[in-house]
Amino acid sequence: MLTLYHQERSPDATSNDRDETPETVVREVHALTPAPEDNSRTMTATLPPPPAFRGYFSPPRSATTMSEGENFTTISREFNALVIAGSSMENNELMTRDVTQREDERQDELMRIHEDTDHEEETNPLAIVPDQYPGSGLDPGSDNGPGQSRVGSTVQRVKREEVEAKITAWQTAKLAKINNRFKREDAVINGWFNEQVNKANSWMKKIERKLEERKAKAMEKTQNNVAKAQRKAEERRATAEAKRGTEVAKVVEVANLMRALGRPPAKRSFFSFS
């Protein structure tokens, strides 16, 4: 077998080198217990090389081999310590998880018992619901541990949410009732208003019809009065025209008579007796 310096080595040296190679040892993990070292391995590490190859092995190389073995032992111990610490942390987490789970189960059982012994639910939305039930042991002021306080605060929060839900439902129902009543009243008011408007329009149309009838009658009467006045005026005009014609004829006749006699008209006429 060839070495680092291209020299052949004997099978004995090869077997010695194989002995120097660290073996994989399967050990059980114990609390900080160092693993027993192999005597053959220690002896192999301390044996000198064969005489034929003593010139090729220097003292620093042997010292390096020994320091590597010590470093490997130290690393193995540190690895074992890390494995033990990790396993202990996992065990602690598992134990903590189991304790928390058992505590939650116990709290669930207490809550179920509390629900079984709970009083009848109040259906009145205006009822005052107490924050705590007497004798239930859920008083936050009592010193029963953080788990009991957490359960008490949870129960109080649930009660507050229930009361708030009831108040919200009552408020919604009341507002809906008020809004529906207002809508009905608004519909009634709108109907009454429309009725009054229709009644006023009907009265106005009736008055307009009466006014049209009266206007027609007044127009007819006016036309009759105008026609009558026109007839009377024509009669009076005819009478005045006839009188004027008669007087003109008298004056012409007197004037002709005076011309015939040759006498001028006197201050007081003979024919004027008035």
Swiss-Prot record:
rRNA-binding found in the keyword field: no
- List, as start-end ranges, the regions of compositional bias called Basic and acidic residues: 1-30, 231-245
Single GO biological process annotation from the record: response to salt stress
Complexes and interactors: Forms homodimer and heterodimer with REM4.1. Interacts with KIN11.
Protein's UniProt name: Remorin 4.2
Upper classification of the organism: Eukaryota, Viridiplantae, Streptophyta, Embryophyta, Tracheophyta
Give the Polar residues compositional bias ranges: 61-71, 145-156
Any single Gene Ontology cellular-component annotation: plasma membrane
Q: Which organism is it from?
A: Arabidopsis thaliana
UniProt-annotated stretches for the region Disordered: 1-71, 117-157, 218-245
Q: What is its induction?
A: Induced by mannitol, NaCl, drought, as well exogenous abscisic acid (ABA) application.
Q: What is the annotated tissue distribution of the protein whose record heads this document? A: Predominantly detected in bud, stem, root, flower, silique, and leaves, and enhanced dramatically in senescence leaf.
Kindly provide the PTM information from the record: Probably ubiquitinated and degraded by the 26S proteasome pathway.
What the protein does?
Collaborates with REM4.1 to positively regulate the BCTV and BSCTV susceptibility.
Q: Which residues cross the membrane?
A: none
Where does it localize?
Cell membrane
So what family is this one in?
Belongs to the remorin family.
State if Membrane is listed as a keyword.
yes
Instruction: Describe the disruption phenotype.
Output: Slightly reduced susceptibility to Beet Curly Top Virus and Beet Severe Curly Top Virus. The double mutant rem4.1 rem4.2 displays resistance to BCTV and BSCTV.
Kindly report the protein's main subcellular placement as a broad class.
membrane
InterPro entries associated with the record? Remorin_C
Q: Which PANTHER family match?
A: OS02G0116800 PROTEIN, REMORIN 4.2
> For this protein, what is any one GO molecular function term?
kinase binding
Coiled coil residues, start to end: 204-239
**Keyword list, A-Z:** Cell membrane, Coiled coil, Membrane, Ubl conjugation
